Amino acid sequence: MVELCALEKGSCRPQDSLQVPMCFAQLLHLEARASASYCSTSVGMDLVRVPFTVGTDLARSSAALSIGAPTAELRAAKLAEFHGSLGADLIGATGDATEGLRLLAAHLGHPGAGLEDLALSCTEDLALLHRGVLKAIAFAFPSGFRPTAKLGLDFATVHAPVADGDALREASGGISAAMSRPGAMFERGVWTLTSLPSLSQHPGNPRPAVSALSELYFRTEFQVIHALGESWAGFSVRVSMTPWNELSDEERTLITASLSTMSPATRSYKGLHGIAELLRV
């Protein structure tokens, strides 16, 4: 397994009341089962559902924004990405992000650190939002997008390309308000399949055509949001990559079943048509 981290089992806490409108509360899956749903195994199999759906799927969380320093190998990989040919796409900030970066650095235990130093001090990729607008980002290992192209965009616009994401976009105002409230802590997880073995799935790194299942990887992201105060919020992403052949038969069957229920639009958005054909779904 190529892994930044294991998704933390037991990181969630029961879903008590959030002070948000009920329509948004329903989208947050406030019932207790949502907690179990996102406390995933080391390869994130609890994220895989049949049928596949696109939603907000936020759960209250006790997970840390960062599990701490990366390994030396991972830090070197991040540094190489930030200073490589695609670096300008991966790390940047708006001119008004200074106060938020100060709060984020203090929250992570690195007061005074700049954005790159913060990113290199954490296992996770990092982002900073103010009232739901992206103000800074340091994503060494993005999933199919150019991170700095999203700077200055609000939550709904950032997620505009997401196929079948109407519920997510409609809830964007409530999500932005909730993540900015004092003490707010949320988590969610997402998964996909890829033929690109690198942690970075930047669109400048084209995915190889896949001809055998052994060339596939199951990729998961564990995402955490913490309110930082003054309407700022920190956002982190930990990535896990597991080779298809290292999954159990039951896990491969579940992934295939979920993929079989994805809409054509979602398959296109995730670049999964060729993989679906290989899996005969």
Spans of model-derived segments:
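Extended, well-ordered protein cores
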Residues: 4-16, 20-281
